Design a protein with these regions (language model features):
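Active-site-proximal alpha-helical scaffold in enzymes
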Residues: 11
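Active-site core of glycosidic bond-cleaving carbohydrate-active enzymes
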Residues: 14-220
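Leucine-rich, amphipathic alpha-helical/linker segments
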Residues: 6-8
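Mature extracytoplasmic enzyme cores
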Residues: 1-3
């Protein structure tokens, strides 16, 4: 089938979480013919986004479920698609969906986002995922990806929104999540969330030793 999935014997449409992970792999494991499947995945979403700007977990689908972490992950991959392919036409069509989706989040008094559970969390397999920290990092990563896309495509109308939220999260992140044992929204430390804090840029080089101790102690 010409779609991204992890269970081809029962899945008929692409799941955004699977698509995000697999698209990133296709850029260096397959030839340029694979770009067409990624393009199809991006453009299919244009016809399935809901009237309240929710991007569904899979499309086409009779059940328009939302999993925010997976959708935010997918938004970051749209930027990768632009960088690898130069297909500005496809990304320009999808860009408004990105902005409208990012506007679904409210900002708290602490400068960080107000957590949205979506239809279900489904952040990762197993137990112990720090869903709130992961969503914060994925949201920030999606913001910076959208800002880079806007810059590359010379779209200026959303700069204030994107830069404002980026700066807000940067100013409030450490106070909310940084603790003696690592980054956490509670009392336990998730290696995935700490690693993502580094990948998205919210954890700087001065935090690498702190994150390293989490990676050495936890294994999810």
């Amino acid at each position: 089938r010409d779609g991204y999935m992890d269970c081809p014997e029962r899945e008929r449409s692409p799941y955004l979480g699977d698509a995000a992970n697999q698209i990133s792999e296709t850029f260096y494991s397959l030839d340029e013919n694979s770009y067409e499947m990624t393009k199809k995945t991006i453009l299919t979403l244009l016809g399935w986004v809901t009237t309240d700007n929710i991007i569904p977990l899979r499309s086409p689908s009779q059940t328009l479920n939302e999993c925010p972490a997976q959708t935010l992950n997918f938004l970051t991959v749209v930027r990768e698609y632009l960088l690898y392919t130069g297909d500005s036409q496809t990304v320009r069509k999808f860009y408004p969906l990105m902005i409208n989706y990012l506007k679904l989040w409210e900002m708290g008094d602490d400068g960080c986002i107000v957590y949205r559970p979506g239809t279900f969390m489904w952040t990762d397999w197993g137990e112990g995922a720090d869903d709130k920290l992961l969503q914060e990092c994925w949201y920030y990563y999606a913001l910076t990806s959208a800002l880079d896309i806007a810059d590359r495509l010379s779209i200026a109308g959303d700069t204030q929104f994107l830069e404002g939220r980026i700066q807000s999260i940067e100013s409030g992140f450490d106070a909310k999540y940084k603790k003696a044992g690592g980054f956490s929204s509670g009392t336990s430390y998730d290696d995935r969330a700490n690693a993502l804090a580094v990948v998205c840029g919210l954890a700087g080089e001065e935090d690498y030793a702190l994150v390293s101790q989490v990676l050495k102690m936890q294994e999810k």
